[in-house]
């Protein structure tokens, strides 16, 4: 598997993967990604800012994660408390190809993205997910993330 920055050539595949995820959420009555985002324009902008990263297996993109430097307005106030107020990166739009789920790819994405962040000298990561997205909550806990509260 290869971890790399996404390119414009990946865009159709990334849109297809996010559309699959939207349908999966909808089928499970999870109101995540049901209001239009992520969409092609959001992903294209993330590619142009070198924030969208992918995991590739035998030439096929099978996972994606967006890495954004903080601060972010949505993280300014939470019902709970962050571990600290030091600089951080935020992970967004984590997605794994539906047919590849259950193979540890989310953990691999987190691990690779964490290494990317550490190379910048930043030691904090923030991430949020929908309260009904139990699969992502389990993946985050399994990867050592600590729930600090709700947005």
Predicted regions and their residues:
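Hydrophobic adenine-recognition pocket in adenosine-nucleotide-binding enzymes
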Residues: 6, 94-96, 129
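Conserved acyl-donor/pantetheine-binding loop and adjacent beta-alpha core of acyl/acetyltransferases
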Residues: 66-95, 101
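Conserved GNAT acetyl-CoA-binding A-motif
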Residues: 110, 117-129
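Conserved GNAT-fold acetyl-CoA-binding loop/helix
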Residues: 22-42
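Conserved acetyl-CoA-binding loop-helix of GNAT-fold acetyltransferases
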Residues: 96, 102-115, 138-142
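Conserved active-site alpha-helix within GNAT-family acetyltransferase domains
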Residues: 107, 119, 131-149
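A short beta-loop-alpha structural element at the N-terminal edge
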Residues: 2-16
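Conserved beta-hairpin
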Residues: 51-67
């Amino acid at each position: 598997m290869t971890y790399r920055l996404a390119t414009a050539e990946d865009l159709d595949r990334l849109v297809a993967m996010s559309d699959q995820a939207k349908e999966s959420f909808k089928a499970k009555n999870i109101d995540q990604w049901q209001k239009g985002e992520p969409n092609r324009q959001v992903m294209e902008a993330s590619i142009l800012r070198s924030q969208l990263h992918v995991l590739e297996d035998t030439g096929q993109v099978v996972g994606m994660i967006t890495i954004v430097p903080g601060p972010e307005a949505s993280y300014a106030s939470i019902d709970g408390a962050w571990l600290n107020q030091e600089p951080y990166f935020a992970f967004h739009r984590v997605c794994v190809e539906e047919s590849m789920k259950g193979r540890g790819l989310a953990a691999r994405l987190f691990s690779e993205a964490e290494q990317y962040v550490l190379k910048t000298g930043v030691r904090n990561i923030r991430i949020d997910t929908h309260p009904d997205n139990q699969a992502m909550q389990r993946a985050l806990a399994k990867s050592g993330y600590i729930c600090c509260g709700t947005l």
